[in-house]
Design a protein with these regions (language model features):
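Loop/turn elements at helix/coil->beta-strand transitions in domains of secreted/extracellular proteins
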Residues: 19-25, 63-69, 95-100, 125-132, ...
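Charged helix-capping and loop-helix junction motifs
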Residues: 85-86, 115-116, 152-158
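Aromatic- and acid-rich polysaccharide-binding/catalytic face
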Residues: 13, 24-30, 69, 73, ...
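Aromatic-rich peripheral "rim/lid" segments of glycoside hydrolase catalytic domains that contact
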Residues: 93, 102, 143-271, 297-338
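Short, acidic/polar
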Residues: 6-13, 113-121, 158
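Active-site clefts of carbohydrate-active enzymes
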Residues: 30-43, 98-109, 121-155
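Short, solvent-exposed loop/linker segments at beta-strand-coil boundaries, enriched for Pro/Gly
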Residues: 272-276
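Active-site mouth of glycoside hydrolases
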Residues: 1-85
Length: 339
């Protein structure tokens, strides 16, 4: 009766949060394991895991039909990884809607980051479920804080992972934001920790910036319209965003992180219609170019949240390119171009 006991435990959660709009879904089984079972990963997945997911979802639906159900694949035993991917491939559909495929990726090898995510995308398509990476980010070794070489290595594979996420247009959660701060010893490289802060307080303040500067990169948080593509280019500190606007959906919010990424200020290009800049010494935007009939009151800087807020795009129901670049805009002297 272990499955029934497990589901009964979930019932308390479903009852408590059935009307809570801030709880959008449930991660049904975290990193399911085979361990010592004498069974193949395919059989374990098809015969036990997927039917169990369906059983859990059937029990959850009477509480709320709008919640999302996050599912994961089998976390394989040490030594069983395929192409450095520790998670077994799901090859069979689940007969339910409202699914979110929520794999984990802890990949420090540059050559395997994109192939791993491509494998996950294949499963996402089969399941007809969007991807939310529930955990990512290789742990920090005890030696890393004092080694510039190790930190540069972390920066490289963290950036590559973030770029793949953004190119695919998926969300991801870095594990874990506050710790644990204690070190564990389960990797060949020695003791390691998941914490992104290096101090010993419960709520840290001393960031491991070789990690936090990557995960706190500029990105579109909320868009009135549809995102076609976006990418933050770390080398140039430039955010490129392409959207189809739809002002009927309300306001848009872009996380800039100016105090982290743009201590020299930044400039925003919105199509050919508008150029704004924000100096670290000023409270609001400076307008360098604006087409007629644009309501400049629709463009707001939220200092506390480090957000660029757009109440309405200059053109509705149209394709629009947005670019955020470092530094304050300087108009090119036409005489310099001619020379």
């Amino acid at each position: 009766n272990e499955q029934d006991i497990y589901i009964d435990a979930w019932r308390h959660v479903w009852e408590a949060f059935k009307d809570d709009d801030f709880v959008i879904g449930y991660d049904l089984v975290n990193e399911p394991r085979k361990l010592t079972m004498d069974i193949s990963y395919d059989e374990l997945t098809n015969r036990y895991l997927l039917p169990f997911y369906e059983k859990i979802i059937d029990a959850a639906l009477p509480y709320s039909k709008d919640k999302q159900f996050l599912i994961q694949s089998i976390f394989m035993n040490k030594g069983d990884a395929v192409k450095r991917n520790q998670y077994h491939e799901i090859k069979k559909k689940i007969n339910h809607k409202n699914l979110v495929f929520a794999p984990h990726i802890y990949q420090e090898n540059l050559d395997y980051i994109e192939p791993t995510m491509q494998r996950f995308e294949k499963e996402s398509t089969l399941l007809n479920a969007p991807i939310l990476v529930g955990e990512w980010g290789f742990p920090t070794f005890v030696t890393t804080d004092n080694s510039t070489t190790e930190q540069l290595n972390y920066i490289e594979f963290y950036i590559r992972t973030a770029e793949v996420f953004d190119r695919m247009g998926i969300g991801a959660i870095k594990a874990w934001f506050l710790g644990n701060r204690s070190y564990q010893n389960f990797l060949p490289g020695g003791e390691s920790t998941w914490a992104i802060f290096s101090d010993k307080q419960a709520v840290g303040t001393v960031e491991r910036k070789y990690i936090t500067d990557i995960i706190a990169r500029p990105y579109p948080q909320l868009i009135a319209g549809d995102i076609e593509q976006f990418m933050f280019h770390f080398a140039t500190r430039t955010l490129d965003l392409s959207i189809q606007t739809d002002n009927s959906r309300g306001a848009s919010k872009l996380f800039i992180g100016a105090d982290r990424h743009y201590p020299d200020g930044f400039t925003i290009h919105i199509g050919e219609q508008l150029i704004l800049s924000k100096s670290p010494l000023s409270m609001g935007f400076k307008v360098h170019h604006s087409e007629a009939n644009i309501d400049l009151g629709n463009f707001v800087w939220d200092e506390s949240r480090q957000q660029f807020v757009v109440l309405a795009w200059p053109k509705d129901k149209s394709q629009l390119s947005i670019q955020i670049k470092p530094g304050i805009y300087k108009k090119t002297d036409p005489m310099a171009k001619n020379n």
